[in-house]
Amino acid sequence: MVRLLSRWLPLLALLLMSGCTSLPDGARGRFEARAVKVDGETAYYQVFIPAASARTPGSLPVVLFLHGSGERGADGVKQTHAGLGPYLREQAADFPALAVFPQAPGRGEWSGRNNRVALAALDAAIAEFGADPARQYLTGMSMGGYGSWNIALDQPGRFAAIVPVCGAVLAPRAVRPTLFVEQVAGETDPYAAIAQRLRQTPIWIFHGALDDVVPPDDDRRLHAAFQNANARDVRYTEYPEGNHNAWDATYADPAMWEWMFAQKR
């Protein structure tokens, strides 16, 4: 019996140690479901609430995240399964901000009512959790990258910083004619128009050089337009070996978050 116990003692010790190092629920951030009514219809979204130990003194910063095409739907959850959501689950004990995850319906784009839903969800989260209106941040990936430009152009004085990931302005309209930045659709030079209207907003654009879904050409042109407009602080990072999923490297980059949270309105 003693010999049998001695064989299992190392395993028992390991299990006890792992149990001791796991964090209690209150020490980790969590997602909670919420709903908002816009134009008479209810839309569901998620809010990431940071752990108390991760919060800095004062009001919480808040990040509005716009998902890509693959996360569209009506379940109110799928939008947390790619991009920022998985990163927050990995960093649930340390991420210091609220994050709001609206969801566009099945074949919708980030435009019109869907953008109103996103902003209504953001407003509701700010009111419920006492977030800092001067520290609102906007990011989106792929379709959400387009949406980031649309919402930022519609609300030019609202966000302290914008981080569009693998988005574009016009391309690839031939493949998907509904996917474009509608706020500048009538402009002769939409890149220059965006740069002029947002040149006072800190922006960090990310893209993969090998992106074969949304090629990086538009983001390169946008960055050049911002430079020509003498923009206040616009950066562009292109991952040489990166494909469309540039969001994985972007959201895992501590320098990006440090820069973002340093911005205030």
Language-model-derived ranges and their functions:
Residues Q46, V62-L66, L98-Q103, R135-G140, ...:
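Structural recognition of the beta-strand scaffold that forms the well-ordered cores
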Residues C20-V62, T139-M141, V184-G186, R220-A224, ...:
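A domain-start/cap signature at the N-terminus of enzymes
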Residues A161, C166-Y251:
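The feature captures the conserved acid-bearing segment of alpha/beta-hydrolase catalytic domains
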Residues V62, L66-A121:
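Active-site machinery of serine-nucleophile hydrolases
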Residues M1-L9:
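Bacterial N-terminal signal peptides that target proteins for export
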Residues G145-P156, I162:
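Short glycine-enriched nucleophile-adjacent loop
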Residues A51-G58, R107-M143, P156:
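Gly/Ser-rich "nucleophile elbow"/oxyanion-hole loop immediately N-terminal to the catalytic nucleophile
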Residues L9-S18:
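Bacterial N-terminal signal peptides
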